[in-house]
């Protein structure tokens, strides 16, 4: 009976018509035998049920055929069924305008790819995908393993292990996973590019307090938990007051004086110092949480995000301003080309960078950095010994310099002596570009390196959104969030290349960075000083904070030094005597 039923079904022709595009699509169907069956006769629930079995790629393609299928394929009911199929254990669809569609696409596009620099295989491999993960938000490779944080705060521990493939034992990266902890907000480790130094993992999480007899109410508190990266064992925990909520954590400094920088929801920076060499000892001690100087001396600033290295920290405000902390003279000279404003006794004093537009995100290497503004322009600064700035030469830059031939990057990464940029080459493809030192295979296809950004021989996934490189491997994170739109704006015609920048006076009425409020704060700080000597020193600090060009800062510092020396010598500096 089954063999006869198949030909009978094939004789009936289904009429694929669109209600909004007309009832007739052609004359060919009229010539067919039998009465055609229109898709309009199917109930909407049946149509949604049928197309919910399609792969996500085919469902998106079907929704682009006509208006009717676009409305059907865009329904939340279809995406709810797909999301249940992709992530059966997902209980909550999350938040947003389109929660089920967002959740389904997050879980469909999630993936972590890696390519080893050494060896014969020069292709991307995919790590194990945790079934419990709700998309991938960020990741961090350590010495032995990889840690991934999803969109519901679950931190996964992807282990390297020996596996048997075709009867042969092979060492594979990120092939097994376990859940490290839940309720995580952010995590960090040693900021150096070499993963050998990443012994501990610091996790910023929210925990419900333990029930105490005699209390009726309990509030969730933020805490920092420290884990061994090798085994995932928790060795230390510090809990904060429930009134303080944080959203980001970064590390800076050496192991014996490791500084933890914590960013609050209000945009303030707090710091505390721990000794990593004593974390594995079974004892408890108290650490002091203090307000960082960037938030103490500049209270009007609201920090949006921060990034760090072993001896420097970069802050980006909500208005797009950038402030720098440099803690060693060598790195300061590489970044700014001078030691004029470096104070070894006050290393936390922030310095403002002079930038033409609002900065969206940045990347910080050991002695160079990259900035991306709201128009998609890339600015590089710092040491350029290996051509890691991508300017086409090997001359150091003491102030942000635009890389004119590269715009609108997806993400930017700066390493020890090379830089990587993930760019959208076309609508359906992405490419990875790099510059700097190519030793050890860190620039695939360019073993001798390059002083300009060149296309690397890496097959980039379609939904790649983040990248990271270690000494042994290149990692690419794949994820797509439909609620994250393109952040870039079109550059005004008056500010295209070849047109002079508008003067400070022309932009003063807009005051995008709150400069007027900042100047009032500076004046109040100078007024609070008691002596002329203290006021001169405070003015030097303020010059370092203000977004001035390097030559302008040197001029003001030299002029203030002249006035200070004249004051110390007992003689005043006045106008020259008139000629007779």
From Swiss-Prot:
UniProt GO cellular component terms: SCF ubiquitin ligase complex; ubiquitin ligase complex
GO MF: ubiquitin-protein transferase activity
Record-annotated disulphide pairs: none
Pfam families from the UniProt entry: F-box-like (PF12937), RCC1 (PF00415)
RCC repeats, residue ranges: 376-425
Domain F-box, chain residue ranges per copy: 36-82
PROSITE patterns: FBOX (PS50181), RCC1_3 (PS50012)
Keywords, sorted A to Z: Ubl conjugation pathway
GO biological process: axoneme assembly; chromatin organization; mitochondrion organization; mRNA splicing, via spliceosome; piRNA processing; protein catabolic process; protein ubiquitination; single fertilization
PANTHER family linked to this entry: F-BOX ONLY PROTEIN 24 (PTHR47004:SF1)
Complex and partners: Directly interacts with SKP1 and CUL1.
Task of the protein: Substrate-recognition component of the SCF (SKP1-CUL1-F-box protein)-type E3 ubiquitin ligase complex.
Listed name of the protein: F-box only protein 24
Gene source species: Homo sapiens
